[in-house]
Curated annotation (Swiss-Prot):
Record keyword Flavoprotein present: yes
Family note: Belongs to the WrbA family.
Pfam family, one: FMN_red
The keyword Metal-binding belongs to this UniProt entry's keyword annotation: no
GO cellular component, one term: membrane
Cofactor detail note: Binds 1 FMN per monomer.
Organism: Rhodopseudomonas palustris (strain BisB18)
The name this protein goes by in its record: NAD(P)H dehydrogenase (quinone)
Residues annotated as domain Flavodoxin-like: 4-190
Length: 199
């Protein structure tokens, strides 16, 4: 049975919610799924003053954990059109795995959030995907089999490069049913691909 890691960073809980949806989809496909998060870099007093969501259930991942999975699905919020420093710091430590080719052939995917529709969703997805390709991974996005990608009836995240959500400038908007559906769909497709490749 394929093993899937949903690895994320979430300051305010939006990506945590998306990560849970991605994991639901992967489990639906029959994979064994773990959800883990990367370490926080912001000092606790500043994170608390900034109203970060610090009570997240997922355990903290280590870089060595990456070797134990057939698929790794990475989610993080957007900072100025790119991945957060927390996720970048974590992935930058995977040089040893990269040098040994440990991640070659594993399946990967990306998901993100932005404050607005035009806040850098696709550039952030590409910054995750670039890491996955350097690791030698097989990248799977959110294909148009998910009909919610083409909706014009609502403000909605989502891209063929990965599931996304829009949070609003103050973070008040939570992932919509359509966005969560996209996350579940992507998780399922990635897990199905991992099962085909790795059993």
């Amino acid at each position: 049975m394929a093993k899937v890691l949903v690895l994320y960073y979430s300051a305010y809980g939006h990506i945590e919610t998306m990560a849970n949806a991605v994991a639901e989809g992967a489990r639906e496909a029959g994979a064994t799924v773990d959800i883990k998060r990367v370490p926080e870099l912001v000092p606790p007093e500043i994170a608390k003053a900034s109203h970060y969501k610090l009570d997240q259930a997922a355990p903290i991942a280590t870089v060595d954990d990456l070797a134990n999975y057939d698929a790794i699905i990475i989610g993080t919020g957007t900072r100025f059109g790119r991945i957060t420093s927390q996720m970048a710091n974590f992935l930058d430590q995977a040089g040893g795995l990269w040098a040994k080719g440990v991640l070659h052939g594993k399946v990967g995917g990306a998901f993100t959030s932005t404050a607005s529709q035009h806040g850098g969703q696709e550039t952030t997805l590409f910054s995750i995907i670039t890491n996955l390709l350097h690791f030698g991974m097989v990248v799977v996005g959110l294909n148009y089999g998910y009909g919610g990608l083409t909706t014009l009836d609502e403000v909605a995240g989502g891209s063929p490069y990965g599931a996304t959500t829009i949070t609003g400038g103050d973070g008040a908007r939570q992932p919509s049913a359509n966005e969560l559906g996209g996350a579940r769909y992507q998780g399922k497709v990635i897990a199905e691909t991992a099962i085909k490749l790795h059993g």
